[in-house]
């Protein structure tokens, strides 16, 4: 017992000395493990008031995505509200045979340091400056042209799940820094797909943020709905292959502090993708309701009517539901550790007269010119047609 007390005292003194040394040196030092522990201990608040969900303990503070923090200038890595309902339909043109061409530009960078939670900074790797990258959207049969530019310091690529030729798979044509590549393929098999860097070590490129969502709509459109994209992700901030923070759309606890407003009785469609590294499974549980589950989104007939779906890494689904009653309804990972470390949010269901219109946004290539000629970098050429 005496030895134990001495050890504790020594450790405590050493910790105090180290903490003082960092403070005296004037360094911007963040103890990420302590931050993760604090995130578990502090109660969540919304606008300074308790949310009423005492079982879910959160940081109490949430990152404001439109402001700058600490020593890092510029916005946070994503605005979850803006991302939620934004779809990039690309620059549209027509081929001689009448086929639609959708041209996108994705720029990879691996040199940014951004804040992912209050006081927690991370070396983010991004497509077009955000995690996740822009949501690319097309209709089955469209010709997809992705102008890829590697503005990073490491080799990168783009691997899009779905049907395409081998040379368009993003595995063998690694693009070196300052290089370019043009991916071309037809949008085949409607559904929801992830895209991500496929350079090894793969877990490093994905866990740092090089991923996004690619949606192929069926030729006969799905019923009109309030559509949104949710990527389940997380961050290993101390690099021990165990995540310290979990989220949907990158910012932990964000939708607890900023509930997603939806209209009572209106059809909601969620494109859900699991891009969480290091943990083998993730899931989505909805309170007070059930949803029609379309696994991979490759069928127009639902696979299941449920309030819970579990996914492995890279799996995805479409969820459709509507709420009969107004109020606040939680959604979260049913792996409690994930929820208590950030993967938790709220839907705020309102009568139509009380809610602003929630229309989907759009952009042209995530703010980048769709033409690859706009970027005077080394070009990697390809040969052959793109298939039919």
Can you describe what each PLM-predicted range is?
Residues 2-388:
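Copper-binding active sites and cupredoxin-like electron-transfer domains
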């Amino acid at each position: 017992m005496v030895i134990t007390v001495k050890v504790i005292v020594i450790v405590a003194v050493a910790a105090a000395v180290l903490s003082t040394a960092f403070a005296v040196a004037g360094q911007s030092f963040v103890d990420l493990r302590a931050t993760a522990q604090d995130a578990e201990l502090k109660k969540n608040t919304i606008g300074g008031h308790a949310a009423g969900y005492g079982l879910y303990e959160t940081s109490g503070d949430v990152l404001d995505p439109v402001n700058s923090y600490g020593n890092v200038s510029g916005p946070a890595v994503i605005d979850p509200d803006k991302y939620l309902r934004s779809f990039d339909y690309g620059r549209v043109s027509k081929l001689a045979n009448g086929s639609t061409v959708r041209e996108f530009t994705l720029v990879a960078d691996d040199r940014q340091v951004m804040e992912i939670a209050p006081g927690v900074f991370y070396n983010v790797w991004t497509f077009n400056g955000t995690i996740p990258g822009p949501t690319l959207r097309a209709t089955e049969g469209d010709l997809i042209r992705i102008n890829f530019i590697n503005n990073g310091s490491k080799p990168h690529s783009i691997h899009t799940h779905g049907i395409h030729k081998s040379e368009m798979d993003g595995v063998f044509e690694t693009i070196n820094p300052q290089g370019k590549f043009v991916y071309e393929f037809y949008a085949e098999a409607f559904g929801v797909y992830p895209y991500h860097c496929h350079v090894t070590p793969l877990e490093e490129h994905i866990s740092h943020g090089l991923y996004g969502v690619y949606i192929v709509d069926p030729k006969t459109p799905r019923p009109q709905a309030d559509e949104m994209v949710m990527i389940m992700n997380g961050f290993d901030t101390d690099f021990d292959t165990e995540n310290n923070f979990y989220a949907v759309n990158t910012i932990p606890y964000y939708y607890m502090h900023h509930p997603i407003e939806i209209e009572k009785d209106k059809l909601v469609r969620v494109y859900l993708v699991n891009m969480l590294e290091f943990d083998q499974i993730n899931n989505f549980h909805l309170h007070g309701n059930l949803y029609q589950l379309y696994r991979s989104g490759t069928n127009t007939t639902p696979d299941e009517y449920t309030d819970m779906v579990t996914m492995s890494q890279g799996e995805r689904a479409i969820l459709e539901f509507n709420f009969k009653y107004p109020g606040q309804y939680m959604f979260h990972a049913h792996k409690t550790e994930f929820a208590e470390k950030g993967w938790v949010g709220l839907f705020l269901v309102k009568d139509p007269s009380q809610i602003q219109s929630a229309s989907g946004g759009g952009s042209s290539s995530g703010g980048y010119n769709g033409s690859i000629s706009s970027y005077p970098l080394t070009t990697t050429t390809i040969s052959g047609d793109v298939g039919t």
